[in-house]
Protein backbone atom coordinates (compact mmCIF):
# COMPACT_ATOMS: atom_id res chain seq x y z
CA UNK A 1 0.00 0.00 0.00
CA UNK A 2 2.75 2.46 0.84
CA UNK A 3 1.85 5.94 1.99
CA UNK A 4 -1.70 7.23 1.62
CA UNK A 5 -1.97 9.76 -1.21
CA UNK A 6 -2.78 13.35 -0.26
CA UNK A 7 -6.36 14.47 -0.88
CA UNK A 8 -6.98 17.59 -2.96
CA UNK A 9 -10.25 19.25 -3.92
CA UNK A 10 -10.74 20.85 -7.32
CA UNK A 11 -13.62 22.93 -8.57
CA UNK A 12 -14.35 22.96 -12.31
CA UNK A 13 -15.52 26.28 -13.72
CA UNK A 14 -16.38 27.56 -17.19
CA UNK A 15 -19.20 28.56 -19.48
CA UNK A 16 -22.22 26.28 -19.75
CA UNK A 17 -21.17 24.88 -23.13
CA UNK A 18 -17.44 24.72 -22.55
CA UNK A 19 -17.54 20.95 -22.14
CA UNK A 20 -17.12 20.86 -18.36
CA UNK A 21 -19.22 17.74 -17.98
CA UNK A 22 -17.50 15.86 -20.76
CA UNK A 23 -14.04 16.75 -19.52
CA UNK A 24 -14.76 15.98 -15.87
CA UNK A 25 -16.61 12.84 -16.88
CA UNK A 26 -13.61 11.72 -18.93
CA UNK A 27 -11.19 12.06 -16.01
CA UNK A 28 -13.52 10.29 -13.63
CA UNK A 29 -14.19 7.59 -16.23
CA UNK A 30 -10.53 6.93 -16.96
CA UNK A 31 -8.90 7.46 -13.57
CA UNK A 32 -11.68 7.29 -11.23
CA UNK A 33 -14.16 5.95 -8.86
CA UNK A 34 -16.77 4.68 -11.27
CA UNK A 35 -16.74 0.92 -11.26
CA UNK A 36 -16.93 -1.04 -14.51
CA UNK A 37 -20.45 -2.32 -13.68
CA UNK A 38 -21.88 1.18 -13.46
CA UNK A 39 -20.19 2.14 -16.71
CA UNK A 40 -21.55 -0.93 -18.48
CA UNK A 41 -25.01 -0.07 -17.19
CA UNK A 42 -24.69 3.51 -18.49
CA UNK A 43 -23.33 2.28 -21.85
CA UNK A 44 -26.25 -0.08 -22.26
CA UNK A 45 -28.76 2.67 -21.45
CA UNK A 46 -26.98 5.06 -23.78
CA UNK A 47 -27.16 2.55 -26.63
CA UNK A 48 -30.86 1.91 -25.99
CA UNK A 49 -31.53 5.63 -26.12
CA UNK A 50 -29.63 5.88 -29.38
CA UNK A 51 -26.84 7.79 -27.65
CA UNK A 52 -24.57 5.09 -28.97
CA UNK A 53 -21.76 7.58 -29.32
CA UNK A 54 -21.71 7.19 -25.52
CA UNK A 55 -19.35 9.77 -24.21
CA UNK A 56 -18.28 10.89 -20.84
CA UNK A 57 -20.78 13.66 -20.30
CA UNK A 58 -23.38 10.91 -20.06
CA UNK A 59 -21.66 9.61 -16.95
CA UNK A 60 -21.82 13.02 -15.38
CA UNK A 61 -25.38 13.67 -16.48
CA UNK A 62 -26.43 10.46 -14.77
CA UNK A 63 -24.63 11.41 -11.59
CA UNK A 64 -26.05 14.92 -11.66
CA UNK A 65 -29.59 13.75 -12.29
CA UNK A 66 -29.37 11.38 -9.36
CA UNK A 67 -27.96 14.11 -7.23
CA UNK A 68 -30.68 16.57 -8.11
CA UNK A 69 -33.39 14.03 -7.41
CA UNK A 70 -31.94 14.07 -3.93
CA UNK A 71 -30.37 10.65 -4.18
CA UNK A 72 -27.09 11.15 -2.47
CA UNK A 73 -24.87 9.17 -4.73
CA UNK A 74 -21.69 7.81 -3.47
CA UNK A 75 -19.37 10.77 -3.59
CA UNK A 76 -16.61 8.35 -4.60
CA UNK A 77 -18.03 8.71 -8.07
CA UNK A 78 -16.75 12.25 -8.16
CA UNK A 79 -13.21 11.18 -7.38
CA UNK A 80 -10.25 10.26 -9.53
CA UNK A 81 -6.57 9.66 -8.92
CA UNK A 82 -3.31 11.10 -10.21
CA UNK A 83 0.08 9.63 -9.35
CA UNK A 84 0.34 11.96 -6.31
CA UNK A 85 -3.23 12.78 -5.33
CA UNK A 86 -6.71 11.55 -4.58
CA UNK A 87 -8.76 14.23 -6.33
CA UNK A 88 -12.34 15.10 -5.40
CA UNK A 89 -14.35 17.22 -7.81
CA UNK A 90 -16.40 19.64 -5.75
CA UNK A 91 -19.73 20.56 -7.19
CA UNK A 92 -19.12 21.90 -10.66
CA UNK A 93 -21.07 25.10 -11.25
CA UNK A 94 -24.25 25.31 -13.24
CA UNK A 95 -25.87 23.83 -10.19
CA UNK A 96 -28.01 26.68 -8.83
CA UNK A 97 -26.58 26.49 -5.35
CA UNK A 98 -23.02 26.38 -6.65
CA UNK A 99 -22.07 29.77 -5.26
CA UNK A 100 -23.56 29.08 -1.87
CA UNK A 101 -21.92 25.65 -1.79
CA UNK A 102 -18.59 27.09 -2.72
CA UNK A 103 -18.74 29.53 0.16
CA UNK A 104 -20.28 27.59 2.99
CA UNK A 105 -18.89 24.64 1.12
CA UNK A 106 -18.26 21.34 2.72
CA UNK A 107 -14.79 21.77 1.41
CA UNK A 108 -12.59 24.52 0.19
CA UNK A 109 -11.15 23.92 -3.27
CA UNK A 110 -7.35 23.73 -3.47
CA UNK A 111 -7.37 24.47 -7.19
CA UNK A 112 -9.81 25.65 -9.85
CA UNK A 113 -9.82 24.18 -13.35
CA UNK A 114 -11.15 26.71 -15.83
CA UNK A 115 -12.44 25.08 -19.00
CA UNK A 116 -12.53 27.35 -22.02
CA UNK A 117 -14.19 26.34 -25.30
CA UNK A 118 -11.75 26.86 -28.17
CA UNK A 119 -14.42 26.74 -30.89
CA UNK A 120 -14.85 29.78 -33.14
CA UNK A 121 -17.21 32.22 -31.44
CA UNK A 122 -17.60 29.98 -28.38
CA UNK A 123 -14.51 31.30 -26.66
CA UNK A 124 -15.63 34.87 -27.15
CA UNK A 125 -19.08 34.13 -25.71
CA UNK A 126 -17.61 32.33 -22.73
CA UNK A 127 -15.51 35.17 -21.42
CA UNK A 128 -17.51 38.14 -22.62
CA UNK A 129 -18.27 40.91 -20.15
CA UNK A 130 -21.37 39.35 -18.64
CA UNK A 131 -19.93 35.87 -18.82
CA UNK A 132 -20.63 33.48 -15.98
CA UNK A 133 -17.03 32.39 -16.38
CA UNK A 134 -15.78 35.74 -15.14
CA UNK A 135 -18.09 35.52 -12.15
CA UNK A 136 -16.99 32.01 -11.20
CA UNK A 137 -13.29 32.77 -11.64
CA UNK A 138 -13.60 35.93 -9.58
CA UNK A 139 -15.44 34.02 -6.89
CA UNK A 140 -12.84 31.32 -6.78
CA UNK A 141 -10.12 33.93 -6.40
CA UNK A 142 -11.97 36.03 -3.82
CA UNK A 143 -12.71 32.95 -1.76
CA UNK A 144 -9.08 31.98 -1.54
CA UNK A 145 -8.68 29.39 -4.31
CA UNK A 146 -5.16 30.47 -5.19
CA UNK A 147 -4.22 27.84 -7.81
CA UNK A 148 -5.63 27.72 -11.31
CA UNK A 149 -5.34 25.45 -14.36
CA UNK A 150 -6.74 26.48 -17.74
CA UNK A 151 -7.84 23.77 -20.19
CA UNK A 152 -8.61 24.97 -23.72
CA UNK A 153 -11.22 22.45 -24.83
CA UNK A 154 -12.70 21.48 -28.21
CA UNK A 155 -9.37 22.03 -29.98
CA UNK A 156 -10.49 19.35 -32.45
CA UNK A 157 -13.23 21.72 -33.66
CA UNK A 158 -10.59 24.23 -34.81
CA UNK A 159 -8.40 21.47 -36.29
CA UNK A 160 -5.74 21.91 -33.58
CA UNK A 161 -4.82 25.32 -34.97
CA UNK A 162 -1.71 26.57 -33.18
CA UNK A 163 -2.51 30.24 -33.83
CA UNK A 164 -5.99 29.86 -32.40
CA UNK A 165 -4.55 28.27 -29.24
CA UNK A 166 -2.01 31.08 -28.84
CA UNK A 167 -4.66 33.74 -29.38
CA UNK A 168 -6.82 32.11 -26.70
CA UNK A 169 -3.90 31.89 -24.27
CA UNK A 170 -3.19 35.58 -24.76
CA UNK A 171 -6.81 36.59 -24.15
CA UNK A 172 -7.27 34.20 -21.24
CA UNK A 173 -4.03 35.35 -19.60
CA UNK A 174 -5.40 38.88 -19.57
CA UNK A 175 -8.68 37.60 -18.26
CA UNK A 176 -7.20 35.64 -15.34
CA UNK A 177 -4.85 38.53 -14.55
CA UNK A 178 -7.84 40.87 -14.23
CA UNK A 179 -9.41 38.38 -11.85
CA UNK A 180 -6.25 38.37 -9.71
CA UNK A 181 -4.23 35.30 -10.78
CA UNK A 182 -0.66 35.50 -12.07
CA UNK A 183 -0.71 33.85 -15.54
CA UNK A 184 2.89 32.67 -15.06
CA UNK A 185 1.69 30.30 -12.34
CA UNK A 186 -1.11 28.91 -14.53
CA UNK A 187 -0.67 25.90 -16.84
CA UNK A 188 -2.55 26.24 -20.19
CA UNK A 189 -3.41 22.86 -21.72
CA UNK A 190 -5.02 22.35 -25.16
CA UNK A 191 -7.41 19.38 -24.93
CA UNK A 192 -10.32 17.55 -26.43
CA UNK A 193 -12.46 16.31 -23.55
CA UNK A 194 -14.50 14.36 -26.08
CA UNK A 195 -11.70 12.56 -27.92
CA UNK A 196 -9.32 12.52 -24.99
CA UNK A 197 -6.39 14.43 -26.51
CA UNK A 198 -3.91 15.66 -23.85
CA UNK A 199 -6.25 14.56 -21.10
CA UNK A 200 -4.25 11.60 -19.84
CA UNK A 201 -1.94 10.81 -22.76
CA UNK A 202 -0.12 13.41 -24.85
CA UNK A 203 -1.93 13.99 -28.16
CA UNK A 204 -0.42 13.27 -31.57
CA UNK A 205 -2.69 15.88 -33.16
CA UNK A 206 -0.65 18.92 -32.15
CA UNK A 207 3.04 18.34 -32.89
CA UNK A 208 3.56 22.08 -32.35
CA UNK A 209 2.54 21.82 -28.68
CA UNK A 210 5.64 21.58 -26.52
CA UNK A 211 3.77 21.31 -23.23
CA UNK A 212 2.64 23.62 -20.45
CA UNK A 213 4.80 25.27 -17.82
CA UNK A 214 4.17 27.12 -14.60
CA UNK A 215 6.28 28.92 -12.04
CA UNK A 216 6.19 27.79 -8.42
CA UNK A 217 8.16 28.80 -5.34
CA UNK A 218 10.48 25.88 -5.91
CA UNK A 219 11.08 26.61 -9.60
CA UNK A 220 9.60 25.80 -13.00
CA UNK A 221 7.29 22.83 -13.49
CA UNK A 222 6.41 21.45 -16.92
CA UNK A 223 4.14 18.77 -18.35
CA UNK A 224 1.95 17.87 -21.31
CA UNK A 225 -1.44 16.67 -20.14
CA UNK A 226 -4.30 17.90 -17.99
CA UNK A 227 -3.76 14.99 -15.61
CA UNK A 228 -0.11 16.05 -15.16
CA UNK A 229 -1.22 19.63 -14.50
CA UNK A 230 -3.55 18.37 -11.77
CA UNK A 231 -0.75 16.20 -10.40
CA UNK A 232 1.42 19.33 -10.24
CA UNK A 233 -0.97 21.18 -7.90
CA UNK A 234 1.06 22.42 -4.93
CA UNK A 235 0.11 20.31 -1.92
CA UNK A 236 -2.34 22.10 0.34
CA UNK A 237 -1.30 22.81 3.91
CA UNK A 238 -3.99 21.68 6.28
CA UNK A 239 -4.31 24.04 9.23
CA UNK A 240 -3.73 21.62 12.13
CA UNK A 241 -1.48 24.08 13.95
CA UNK A 242 -4.19 26.73 14.26
CA UNK A 243 -6.56 26.82 17.25
CA UNK A 244 -9.63 24.59 16.96
CA UNK A 245 -12.66 25.79 15.00
CA UNK A 246 -15.48 23.33 14.44
CA UNK A 247 -18.82 24.71 13.18
CA UNK A 248 -21.71 22.46 14.27
CA UNK A 249 -23.88 20.89 11.59
CA UNK A 250 -26.24 19.18 14.02
CA UNK A 251 -26.63 18.29 17.69
CA UNK A 252 -28.02 14.88 18.57
CA UNK A 253 -29.30 13.42 21.78
CA UNK A 254 -28.31 9.78 21.92
CA UNK A 255 -29.79 7.48 24.55
CA UNK A 256 -27.21 6.22 27.03
CA UNK A 257 -24.54 8.56 25.66
CA UNK A 258 -25.99 12.03 25.94
CA UNK A 259 -25.42 15.12 23.82
CA UNK A 260 -23.44 14.59 20.61
CA UNK A 261 -22.61 17.63 18.46
CA UNK A 262 -21.56 16.81 14.88
CA UNK A 263 -19.53 18.90 12.47
CA UNK A 264 -16.45 19.26 10.36
CA UNK A 265 -13.11 20.26 11.88
CA UNK A 266 -12.02 23.36 9.92
CA UNK A 267 -8.83 24.20 11.82
CA UNK A 268 -6.93 22.71 14.75
CA UNK A 269 -7.59 19.36 16.38
CA UNK A 270 -10.22 17.99 18.75
CA UNK A 271 -9.62 15.14 21.17
CA UNK A 272 -11.07 13.55 24.28
CA UNK A 273 -10.20 15.37 27.52
CA UNK A 274 -10.15 18.80 25.88
CA UNK A 275 -12.20 21.57 27.46
CA UNK A 276 -14.12 23.28 24.68
CA UNK A 277 -16.23 26.43 24.38
CA UNK A 278 -19.25 26.80 22.11
CA UNK A 279 -19.92 30.28 20.70
CA UNK A 280 -22.08 32.26 20.61
CA UNK A 281 -23.86 30.00 23.16
CA UNK A 282 -21.10 30.66 25.69
CA UNK A 283 -21.06 27.10 27.04
CA UNK A 284 -17.78 25.51 28.19
CA UNK A 285 -17.46 21.79 28.83
CA UNK A 286 -15.27 18.71 28.49
CA UNK A 287 -15.08 16.47 25.42
CA UNK A 288 -15.62 12.86 26.53
CA UNK A 289 -14.94 11.10 23.24
CA UNK A 290 -14.55 11.79 19.51
CA UNK A 291 -15.67 9.48 16.73
CA UNK A 292 -15.91 9.33 12.96
CA UNK A 293 -17.88 6.75 10.96
CA UNK A 294 -18.82 5.08 14.27
CA UNK A 295 -15.21 4.50 15.28
CA UNK A 296 -13.40 6.13 18.20
CA UNK A 297 -10.77 8.62 17.06
CA UNK A 298 -7.66 9.63 18.96
CA UNK A 299 -8.09 13.09 17.42
CA UNK A 300 -10.13 14.81 14.74
CA UNK A 301 -8.11 16.90 12.25
CA UNK A 302 -9.11 19.46 9.60
CA UNK A 303 -11.43 17.91 7.04
CA UNK A 304 -12.77 15.24 9.41
CA UNK A 305 -16.52 15.09 9.94
CA UNK A 306 -16.74 14.08 13.59
CA UNK A 307 -19.28 13.48 16.29
CA UNK A 308 -18.19 14.12 19.88
CA UNK A 309 -19.79 13.53 23.23
CA UNK A 310 -19.95 16.42 25.73
CA UNK A 311 -20.79 16.35 29.44
CA UNK A 312 -23.48 18.34 31.30
CA UNK A 313 -24.78 20.13 28.20
CA UNK A 314 -28.36 19.73 27.02
CA UNK A 315 -29.41 19.66 23.38
CA UNK A 316 -31.27 22.93 23.99
CA UNK A 317 -28.10 24.85 24.84
CA UNK A 318 -26.13 24.41 21.62
CA UNK A 319 -27.27 24.25 18.01
CA UNK A 320 -26.32 24.17 14.33
CA UNK A 321 -24.29 27.28 13.47
CA UNK A 322 -22.52 27.34 16.86
CA UNK A 323 -18.75 27.03 16.69
CA UNK A 324 -16.72 24.80 18.98
CA UNK A 325 -13.16 25.75 19.97
CA UNK A 326 -10.49 25.13 22.59
CA UNK A 327 -11.31 27.07 25.77
CA UNK A 328 -7.58 27.60 26.45
CA UNK A 329 -6.43 28.60 22.96
CA UNK A 330 -8.17 31.59 21.33
CA UNK A 331 -11.68 30.35 22.20
CA UNK A 332 -14.43 31.37 19.76
CA UNK A 333 -16.76 34.22 20.76
CA UNK A 334 -19.98 35.72 19.52
CA UNK A 335 -19.79 39.03 17.67
CA UNK A 336 -21.59 42.37 17.92
CA UNK A 337 -20.66 43.40 14.38
CA UNK A 338 -18.11 42.77 11.66
CA UNK A 339 -16.64 44.57 8.67
CA UNK A 340 -16.61 42.74 5.36
CA UNK A 341 -15.68 43.25 1.75
CA UNK A 342 -18.92 42.48 -0.08
CA UNK A 343 -19.26 41.86 -3.82
CA UNK A 344 -22.79 42.26 -5.19
CA UNK A 345 -23.41 39.58 -7.82
CA UNK A 346 -27.04 39.77 -8.86
CA UNK A 347 -29.42 42.04 -7.06
CA UNK A 348 -32.23 43.55 -9.13
CA UNK A 349 -32.20 46.88 -7.30
CA UNK A 350 -29.97 48.99 -5.12
CA UNK A 351 -28.72 47.94 -1.73
CA UNK A 352 -28.50 50.65 0.90
CA UNK A 353 -27.90 50.77 4.66
CA UNK A 354 -30.62 48.92 6.56
CA UNK A 355 -30.87 46.01 4.09
CA UNK A 356 -31.24 42.80 6.15
CA UNK A 357 -30.81 39.62 4.10
CA UNK A 358 -29.86 36.17 5.39
CA UNK A 359 -26.16 35.32 5.59
CA UNK A 360 -24.84 31.81 5.16
CA UNK A 361 -21.47 31.64 6.87
CA UNK A 362 -20.02 28.18 7.66
CA UNK A 363 -23.10 26.36 9.06
CA UNK A 364 -24.79 29.50 10.43
CA UNK A 365 -27.84 30.88 8.62
CA UNK A 366 -28.71 34.23 10.19
CA UNK A 367 -30.19 37.56 9.08
CA UNK A 368 -27.67 40.41 9.24
CA UNK A 369 -28.20 44.10 8.75
CA UNK A 370 -26.04 46.13 6.34
CA UNK A 371 -25.51 48.75 9.03
CA UNK A 372 -23.12 51.14 7.28
CA UNK A 373 -21.78 51.24 3.72
CA UNK A 374 -18.28 52.36 4.64
CA UNK A 375 -16.76 52.69 1.17
CA UNK A 376 -17.13 51.53 -2.39
CA UNK A 377 -13.98 49.85 -3.71
CA UNK A 378 -12.47 48.47 -6.91
CA UNK A 379 -13.20 44.73 -6.85
CA UNK A 380 -9.80 43.85 -8.18
CA UNK A 381 -7.37 46.17 -6.43
CA UNK A 382 -9.38 46.93 -3.31
CA UNK A 383 -8.68 50.68 -3.82
CA UNK A 384 -11.25 53.08 -2.43
CA UNK A 385 -13.56 54.62 -5.05
CA UNK A 386 -16.07 56.46 -2.86
CA UNK A 387 -16.63 57.18 0.86
CA UNK A 388 -20.02 56.30 2.41
CA UNK A 389 -21.85 55.55 -0.86
CA UNK A 390 -25.65 55.97 -0.71
CA UNK A 391 -26.13 52.51 -2.27
CA UNK A 392 -24.39 49.65 -4.09
CA UNK A 393 -25.68 47.63 -7.05
CA UNK A 394 -24.79 44.52 -9.04
CA UNK A 395 -21.11 44.45 -9.95
CA UNK A 396 -20.07 46.75 -7.10
CA UNK A 397 -17.76 45.91 -4.24
CA UNK A 398 -17.90 47.67 -0.91
CA UNK A 399 -16.66 47.56 2.65
CA UNK A 400 -19.76 47.14 4.81
CA UNK A 401 -20.31 47.11 8.56
CA UNK A 402 -22.69 44.22 9.27
CA UNK A 403 -24.73 43.66 12.43
CA UNK A 404 -26.21 40.19 13.03
CA UNK A 405 -29.85 40.16 14.20
CA UNK A 406 -29.15 37.12 16.41
CA UNK A 407 -25.94 36.06 18.15
CA UNK A 408 -23.47 34.48 15.71
CA UNK A 409 -19.82 33.47 15.62
CA UNK A 410 -17.64 34.51 12.67
CA UNK A 411 -13.93 35.19 12.20
CA UNK A 412 -11.70 37.34 10.01
CA UNK A 413 -10.91 35.55 6.73
CA UNK A 414 -7.17 35.97 7.32
CA UNK A 415 -7.40 34.15 10.68
CA UNK A 416 -9.84 31.34 9.89
CA UNK A 417 -10.79 31.31 6.19
CA UNK A 418 -13.78 28.90 6.40
CA UNK A 419 -15.39 31.11 9.06
CA UNK A 420 -14.58 34.32 7.24
CA UNK A 421 -16.48 33.99 3.97
CA UNK A 422 -20.23 34.19 3.48
CA UNK A 423 -23.02 34.19 0.94
CA UNK A 424 -25.81 36.77 1.08
CA UNK A 425 -29.11 35.09 0.22
CA UNK A 426 -32.27 36.88 -0.81
CA UNK A 427 -35.09 35.98 -3.20
CA UNK A 428 -33.90 32.37 -3.16
CA UNK A 429 -30.58 33.17 -4.72
CA UNK A 430 -27.11 34.34 -3.82
CA UNK A 431 -27.16 38.10 -4.29
CA UNK A 432 -23.69 38.83 -2.90
CA UNK A 433 -20.62 37.23 -1.39
CA UNK A 434 -18.35 38.56 1.28
CA UNK A 435 -15.03 38.16 2.97
CA UNK A 436 -14.76 39.27 6.59
CA UNK A 437 -12.01 41.81 7.31
CA UNK A 438 -12.43 42.35 11.07
CA UNK A 439 -14.77 41.30 13.87
CA UNK A 440 -16.04 43.20 16.90
CA UNK A 441 -16.28 40.31 19.39
CA UNK A 442 -18.68 40.27 22.31
CA UNK A 443 -17.33 39.36 25.71
CA UNK A 444 -20.06 37.74 27.68
CA UNK A 445 -19.48 35.34 30.52
CA UNK A 446 -21.09 32.00 29.79
CA UNK A 447 -21.88 28.75 31.51
CA UNK A 448 -18.96 26.58 32.62
CA UNK A 449 -20.04 23.02 33.38
CA UNK A 450 -18.92 20.96 36.36
CA UNK A 451 -17.08 18.66 33.97
CA UNK A 452 -15.08 21.61 32.65
CA UNK A 453 -14.20 22.78 36.17
CA UNK A 454 -13.10 19.29 37.11
CA UNK A 455 -11.02 18.90 33.95
CA UNK A 456 -9.37 22.26 34.61
CA UNK A 457 -8.16 21.07 38.01
CA UNK A 458 -6.45 18.00 36.58
Curated annotation (Swiss-Prot):
Entry-annotated residues carrying N6-methyllysine: 3, 30, 316, 390
Any one GO CC term of the record: cell surface
Region described as G5: 192-194
tr-type G domain residues: 5-240
Source organism superkingdom: Eukaryota
Subcellular location: Cytoplasm
PTM annotation (N6,N6,N6-trimethyllysine): residues: 79
Region (G3): 91-94
GO molecular function: GTP binding; GTPase activity; translation elongation factor activity
CDD domains in alphabetical order: EF1_alpha (cd01883), EF1_alpha_II (cd03693), EF1_alpha_III (cd03705)
Stretches for region G2: 70-74
UniProt binding sites for GTP: 14-21, 91-95, 153-156
Main location: cytoplasm
Any one Gene Ontology BP term: translation
InterPro entries assigned to the protein according to its UniProt record, in alphabetical order: EFTu-like_2 (IPR004161), G_TR_CS (IPR031157), GTP-eEF1A_C (IPR054696), P-loop_NTPase (IPR027417), T_Tr_GTP-bd_dom (IPR000795), TRAFAC_GTPase_members (IPR050100), Transl_B-barrel_sf (IPR009000), Transl_elong_EF1A/Init_IF2_C (IPR009001)
UniProt similarity note: Belongs to the TRAFAC class translation factor GTPase superfamily. Classic translation factor GTPase family. EF-Tu/EF-1A subfamily.
Role, per record: This protein promotes the GTP-dependent binding of aminoacyl-tRNA to the A-site of ribosomes during protein biosynthesis.
Protein name as it appears in the record: Elongation factor 1-alpha 2
Organism of origin: Candida albicans (strain SC5314 / ATCC MYA-2876) (Yeast)
